[in-house]
Amino acid sequence: DDVQARLAGIQRLLVIAGYDAYPIDGVQGAKTQAAIAKFLNERKLAADAVATPAVFDALIEAARNPEGVGFSWCNDTKYPVMASLGFAEMGSIVTRGWYRVESGQCVRPDLRGDPRRVYSYAEAVDGSGRTVKRGDTALSWGGTLALCTRDGRFELADHKDCAARGLNSTSFAVIDLGNQPATIVRFKDQ
């Protein structure tokens, strides 16, 4: 139907612009509502603008320029990438994952508050969800800060003794957001 097709078009443009509006199915679920609200707020558009044709002009402009505002991951590889994010909250670092970043796409994860620093880890996966390897080394993007993750969906605030608790100790990169209006981490084949 026309309403579902229109919403699927909005979802698709949001995803291209770096917003997390998956799945692209024309159904207005919680993730789609949050992505639309965030887009409208960041672009300083009225809440009812989504019902107007002008929203498509704004979405197309955002899709052409995903660097607009906020933090985004962009995938320049031929593989899907699974990414996880860390941020400071009430004196500790909270890690959350996994975000799927399709080849050639960008995702703007939802950040709480206005952090000056985030922590990022990602790995390329094959069609079965297994980590892509180059020889014996995973095709991944991280750093040196060890934080806990798990294989399935997670949100964790305690990063002591990851292995003893059945979690993975994962090396995150520290990303300084500073006062920049936009920060993009690009995943490239190494």
Q: What positions do the PLM features span?
A:
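Cell-envelope/ECM-targeting effectors and their regulatory/trafficking segments
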Residues: 1-190
